[in-house]
Amino acid sequence: MHELGITQNIVAIVAENANNRLIKRVTLEIGELSAIMPNAIEFCFDVCTQGTVLEGATLEIIKIPGLGKCRQCATEIPLEQPFGICHVCNSVELDIIQGQELKIKEMEVEELSV
């Protein structure tokens, strides 16, 4: 399960950028073609955040659908797997233009009290 290592890296990156403030929420974008299982990330998040500034934070995952572009006719095609056939010209030469990403889109931190 490579999601554990990925989640550990996410927690480390967010904690590093939190400047010792508590994190309330983390939003990730995970592409549906990325081979990353959002359910596993959610499970690992609870474990990996224990004892950190992220402990108790909410994890929000936005799934990004797969999208390919035909090299022959430039048609954009929705993809459920990292390959497919253009429904316009029947070419199998597709470039994946969306759906492989893993991004930390946003983090919400507790406000500093003065």
Curated annotation (Swiss-Prot):
<dbReference type="GO" id="GO:0016151">
    <property type="term" value="F:nickel cation binding"/>
</dbReference>
<feature type="binding site">
    <location>
        <position position="89"/>
    </location>
    <ligand>
        <name>Zn(2+)</name>
    </ligand>
</feature>
<keyword id="KW-0479">Metal-binding</keyword>
<protein>
    <recommendedName>
        <fullName>Hydrogenase maturation factor HypA</fullName>
    </recommendedName>
</protein>
<dbReference type="Pfam" id="PF01155">
    <property type="entry name" value="HypA"/>
</dbReference>
<dbReference type="GO" id="GO:0051604">
    <property type="term" value="P:protein maturation"/>
</dbReference>
<dbReference type="InterPro" id="IPR000688">
    <property type="entry name" value="HypA/HybF"/>
</dbReference>
<comment type="function">
    <text>Involved in the maturation of [NiFe] hydrogenases. Required for nickel insertion into the metal center of the hydrogenase.</text>
</comment>
<feature type="binding site">
    <location>
        <position position="2"/>
    </location>
    <ligand>
        <name>Ni(2+)</name>
    </ligand>
</feature>
<feature type="binding site">
    <location>
        <position position="70"/>
    </location>
    <ligand>
        <name>Zn(2+)</name>
    </ligand>
</feature>
<feature type="binding site">
    <location>
        <position position="73"/>
    </location>
    <ligand>
        <name>Zn(2+)</name>
    </ligand>
</feature>
<keyword id="KW-0862">Zinc</keyword>
<feature type="binding site">
    <location>
        <position position="86"/>
    </location>
    <ligand>
        <name>Zn(2+)</name>
    </ligand>
</feature>
<comment type="similarity">
    <text>Belongs to the HypA/HybF family.</text>
</comment>
<dbReference type="GO" id="GO:0036211">
    <property type="term" value="P:protein modification process"/>
</dbReference>
<keyword id="KW-0533">Nickel</keyword>
<dbReference type="GO" id="GO:0008270">
    <property type="term" value="F:zinc ion binding"/>
</dbReference>
<dbReference type="InterPro" id="IPR020538">
    <property type="entry name" value="Hydgase_Ni_incorp_HypA/HybF_CS"/>
</dbReference>
